[in-house]
Amino acid sequence: MKIVILDGYAANPGDLDYHLLEQLGEVVVYPRTSDEEKVERAKDADIILLNKVQMDAETLAQLPNLKYIGIQATGFNVVDIAAAKKQGIIVTNIPAYSTDSVAQMTFALILAVTNRVEHYTQENRNDRWAYNKDFCYWDTPLMELAGKKLGIMGLGNIGMKVANIARQFGMDVCACTSKNSCDLPEWIQKVSKDGLLATSDILTLHCPLSDDTYHLINEENIGKMKDTAILVNTGRGPLVDEEAVAKALHDQKLGAYCADVMSQEPPSKENPLFKEPNAYLTPHIAWATFEARKRLNRQVAANVKAFLEGNPINVVNP
């Protein structure tokens, strides 16, 4: 059984091993694979594993030996699911492996803004504290989270984890969710989308990307938010109209934008968000803690093993 990993570097730059997969077949690992290389590299594979390499219908048609695609991520929009099913190829993903890490990153971004960590670190390096007349130095407002309203768009695994962390900070938690109110903890208030936009001091996005949620945060909806609101996106880049957000930041119609994802990855250096000092941007690292990648690595092998035993799990094209 030949197993080909097409873009292994992002999830495993060398600090993990593939011993669990190697027990299941011959493993060939490529750090990265371009569109021009993917057919040649996958043509003899029974199983391919990938993260962001695109597998469209045209590509799949050139891989008649392929039996299984294991996506090394939760999202599976990189594969044409319908075409794979038509061709008899099972496709699996890795759900919930990075819940804790993404929730942690969500609050890392929130705290970086409310406590102005980057600003004061730089001011300290510039000797502003060293030459200050007082025992402390601060020149910008700081925000306490207790009593502030955190709005959550989407209450899946990550959204619920974020809600629980917010509760420990003493925040008031409200959410726009498809779940029934009776299925929510009593301390989470279910509200409409417009209600969430209008009342949130901090709004964080944890909904899946779909036709309905593409550019969910656009110029119109930003206009419904508080001018001081902090918007956080650790979900999917295209949930947000980045040009509209950049304009709102520039016009002081939005307090801050924190994102670990962007509409194009890697982003263009011309992206208008890079010009805005109140845009706090990290390079899609929320999922990438060692612990989360270790869980990912193990579950990838478990998915392959289950497939080989005839009882596939985490199938996204049943």
What is each residue range found by the language model?
Residues 163, 167, 249:
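Gly/Ala-rich phosphate-binding loop of Rossmann-like dinucleotide-binding domains
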Residues 159-160:
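N-terminal Rossmann-fold NAD(P) dinucleotide-binding loop
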Residues 87, 95-149, 316:
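Phosphate-binding beta-alpha-beta segment of Rossmann-like dinucleotide-binding domains, i.e.
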Residues 91, 172, 219, 228-318:
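Rossmann-like dinucleotide-binding domain for NAD(H)/NADP(H)
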Residues 155-156:
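Glycine-rich Rossmann-fold phosphate-binding loop(s) that bind the pyrophosphate
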Residues 55-61, 179-272:
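Rossmann-like adenosine-cofactor binding region
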